[in-house]
């Protein structure tokens, strides 16, 4: 099947007709992604609270633990991706589901800090051996770029739905900040494990076998990725996006606390809900209105909007709700454009024969999520609102990289 040009990688008018053409396995993968992330968002956003209240860990110690978990995810992601390229997605998904369930159940049952940290390290496998293989498997099953792009858009949309309602359901049932919630998260991996065991065939799919290359070792795969300048540029953009985004989630609330501790709690809640709702509403229009816009141009547009939103945050020196909601709306539009399209870019730049390893390497973007709060906290302490100038500059750097590499990216994306 001929690959369509990059300008056509998003959704065409027949959205639901296209969704109906997805294999049943893709629908199942999207469903299990939603279920897992829903339970994840009931517990994970409050993990720092648990580590502070239960184990009296300092912000620096929490940052070190989270960064270590992210590093494990990156290393295992490339190794697991290479295994899935050689042996198929099934075996690595089974290992990922099993380890993730064990990790979350360990968090739920931990009676001391050492066991709790051990659980966090095991959870590094969750992102490494579940998330990238799921994306790779969907790409294997959807051979044309247009349907792959739609599947990744839908996956991101479902994750945002989970991000909106997961914490709210957790609050309603009193599950937030409770270690027992991790037990629920761990148990959600078991149905997924059973599905993979029963319905995902062992070995490679027929399409993968046709495109299979001679087996190469992990260090050779890493060398191939390291020499792939276009992919590295896209990966760096993804990391920069993650750093800016995590500043919004982790550093912005601290800044609001500095402005007015009493008003901050309510404002933070309203801002987070506004962000998630704006992303959900706006993304449904993005897929239509940006259909004819090439991927690099979409990412460039999202980066510019990201930079503008950071400048908006910099110039707000009070806790006026309307001002923060306007800034959040601008930020959310940039997020809705950037996040899914960067994922689509990384997917389409990955060679078929090494797709698992390439998508495993894409977990490097989680380093931005891990180290962002630590770096942002230091800059916030030193400069106050100046932290948003730094994130605006990072957004400009993202735009610069995309602009410089846009021609090479387009040429590669348009290759059949």
Question: Would you name each region that the model predicts?
Answer:
Residues 76-88, 281-295, 380:
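Helix-to-loop junctions at the C-terminal end of transmembrane segments
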Residues 74-111:
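Conserved MFS/SLC helix-loop-helix module at the cytosolic interface between two early adjacent transmembrane helices
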Residues 2-23, 201-234:
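Juxtamembrane intracellular "pre-TM" segments in multi-pass secondary transporters
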Residues 98-111, 304-318:
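C-terminal ends and interior cores of transmembrane alpha-helices
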Residues 70-78, 163-164, 276-284, 369-374:
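Residue-level signature of mid-helix packing/kink "hotspots" within the transmembrane helices
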Residues 349-382:
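A late C-terminal transmembrane helix in Major Facilitator Superfamily
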Residues 45-60, 250-271:
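Short amphipathic helix-loop junctions that connect adjacent transmembrane helices
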Residues 121-159:
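Cytoplasmic helix-loop-helix junction between adjacent transmembrane helices
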